[in-house]
Amino acid sequence: MYKPLPDTITIKDSGIHGLGLFAKEEIPSGTVLGMIHFQFNGELMRTPLGAFGNHSDDPTCEKFWDSLENGAGWYLRTKRDIYEGEELTWTYTLYKVTI
């Protein structure tokens, strides 16, 4: 069954901007949270997980390209242990996907 967000994450008001992603419980470093972007018909599409993340110059997460069990795309992984209630952020960059 498709789930737009992992069970460990919720969407709440953010002090950074608008809404953000927050940990509902502690999340260990190196945890793959899910896909944030994928390519469809030549277009880069954003998932719900990718839609609510905020930028930080000191992010708690990092994005990486991979072809995991759910398909090829940009995925999100924690860079360090995340505490309950902490906002999940990553560094926004422009990127071109070539498959």
Predicted regions and their residues:
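Conserved catalytic SET/PR domain of SAM-dependent protein methyltransferases, capturing the structural core
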Residues: 1-99
